[in-house]
Amino acid sequence: MKCPKILAALLGCAVLAGVPAMPAHAAINSMSLGASYDAQQANITFRVYSSQATRIVLYLYSAGYGVQESATYTLSPAGSGVWAVTVPVSSIKAAGITGAVYYGYRAWGPNWPYASNWGKGSQAGFVSDVDANGDRFNPNKLLLDPYAQEVSQDPLNPSNQNGNVFASGASYRTTDSGIYAPKGVVLVPSTQSTGTKPTRAQKDDVIYEVHVRGFTEQDTSIPAQYRGTYYGAGLKASYLASLGVTAVEFLPVQETQNDANDVVPNSDANQNYWGYMTENYFSPDRRYAYNKAAGGPTAEFQAMVQAFHNAGIKVYMDVVYNHTAEGGTWTSSDPTTATIYSWRGLDNATYYELTSGNQYFYDNTGIGANFNTYNTVAQNLIVDSLAYWANTMGVDGFRFDLASVLGNSCLNGAYTASAPNCPNGGYNFDAADSNVAINRILREFTVRPAAGGSGLDLFAEPWAIGGNSYQLGGFPQGWSEWNGLFRDSLRQAQNELGSMTIYVTQDANDFSGSSNLFQSSGRSPWNSINFIDVHDGMTLKDVYSCNGANNSQAWPYGPSDGGTSTNYSWDQGMSAGTGAAVDQRRAARTGMAFEMLSAGTPLMQGGDEYLRTLQCNNNAYNLDSSANWLTYSWTTDQSNFYTFAQRLIAFRKAHPALRPSSWYSGSQLTWYQPSGAVADSNYWNNTSNYAIAYAINGPSLGDSNSIYVAYNGWSSSVTFTLPAPPSGTQWYRVTDTCDWNDGASTFVAPGSETLIGGAGTTYGQCGQSLLLLISK
């Protein structure tokens, strides 16, 4: 995840006084939090957690926005920090609520105790916006239930773009948010099936990362009313199956701030396209639903999952448990002013990690406040949310944004500069600590076995901001990781020759599964998630068509702030007059071949199959525009690239030798110099060598063919001498990514391979390209 603004400095931390002991780990949602009907649908029970509240009142509404409450009910303590009330449905109807039930909470606590003369917009009872223990209760702010299964609307929306109504502090504390605030929606359990979950081993997957809205928003083959919705995405299951994709990974679909995206047409104003500002961890985002009635988004999401499952495709979700949409304090000099939607107004010190004096928030996310992932109650919410999405919504796996924050062993009330678990202050990644969230998740869920079967696939983005948060290779067994080093080193190999030292040893390690990162922890090649590009950065085409980022351009391709300056991109000499579009396509074919021919689990970005471009924008988080929406009307060159990608993926799926369950042995994989000699230490250690080849002994890995791959990183041609293929066979060309082979048949169909020869045959390979042969 990229953030629009990164805080200039992370804040220190100190001991938090007065925080109660955390309850022990328990079964999934053992506190029965949330709002639920009884079996007869005669009563609704509302249960919410707050360890520090002194009073909580339930407010019921007949609509999600713009109306006053129809009824109120005071909750009672139910033990272990839980507050509860059961309300007869007959009473709710008598109050005038005959359709969907919308609800929220108002809470009082030590910094704002209840006063009998309090009324909405009143300051009665007020002591402080934040007290010495970090409490931030404010009864003028209606609070969204953290366990609500659907949300009525976002805080900012076409009817309200004023975020001040949700703020604390002297200027805003008495502003009542009731009519504006997002409400929870009480749901009757859905009967919509999610189909049968695929049990395929992760090593056999090809993952396709895409945004739900962007997937179909401008797809004219889909009826207009379904474009950009869960329903529309489900209609693309056959498209992904035809491409060869086996798992679709959606950018965040939990309720996020995006209802204001269309308020100012053709502008980036107020836009949050990617969705990394979560407002609730249980609710599917209503904006992505065709059916926006109560229960509609839930059932529609489930139906989408069923459509993908029916096509044999897994459904993964990008989840954001490192921070929330509430962010941190508005400034670093005023601790009193902060946004209050939900968690903060219920139990600030439970849900967020606080700094010295408990007035501010510790932040490794760039958004202002770490979610308090070492706290058991906060962990319960994470686990309960994951269980809901896996069990009720049918999701097969999760990609964890800034997952290093979930390995934080620092906790409010337990950290000092010298504390054993927090030697660096308020953040310390510690995979050996059994109580960190990443290990709690492993205990609570079954990870899919290596050979396939039931379970979840878990993917970490293994970095955050500051401290020891860069943890590529540092996660425990059971976790797979986005391999940013794979991306960087292979981009460097293609685009930085002459600008930096290129290590062919690193390229070889990438091709064979990145054992240097994952083997020592007992993991396997498929735990490396191999990608050249994802949403966070340039597209595949732009990596090979841009000399740097251009984020300041006009709508629809900008402007966007932020973005890295380390892209390792190059336009292949186009701007210098030494390259052409055909060279850019060659480079893109080579990059995608790296991705699909390497040991590991390949991850591609939606649109890479047709060379989608963002015109060099590398941080388009804020563009809900045609630039970010996939298109299905292609040029001839784009159609040719699609055929290349489709056949490349099919080749990977047809050859188990490319999908090893364990690390290649010396007899299974042999590295060769261009001369045909086996690569020795002298060759590996010479940083002037930019060409390498390898042969995989297919029969030893259950494959009917052996495979030979040659990569020439030089700018000029290199002659490769082929090793001996298996007895009785010869080498046949499947693809050569060189310019001469640009067109509809760059990657040939099975059975159409071209005979090259046997041992000692020479092959001239053009600069910066890849050759793929099979034995037959």
Curated annotation (Swiss-Prot):
Any one Pfam family match given in the protein's UniProt record, by short name: Isoamylase_C
What is the induction comment?
By maltose.
InterPro entries assigned: GlgX_Isoamylase_N_E_set, Glyco_hydro_13_cat_dom, Glyco_hydro_13_N, Glyco_hydro_b, Glycoside_hydrolase_SF, Ig-like_fold, Ig_E-set, Isoamylase_C
Q: Where are the transmembrane segments?
A: none
- Where in or outside the cell is it found? Secreted
One annotated GO molecular function: isoamylase activity
What GO biological process terms are annotated to this protein in UniProt?
carbohydrate metabolic process
Catalytic residues identified in the record: D401, E461
The record's catalysed reaction(s) read: Hydrolysis of (1->6)-alpha-D-glucosidic branch linkages in glycogen, amylopectin and their beta-limit dextrins
Cofactor info, note text: Binds 1 Ca(2+) ion per subunit.
The record's similarity note reads: Belongs to the glycosyl hydrolase 13 family.
Q: What is this protein called?
A: Isoamylase
Q: What is the lineage of its organism?
A: Bacteria, Pseudomonadati, Pseudomonadota, Gammaproteobacteria, Pseudomonadales
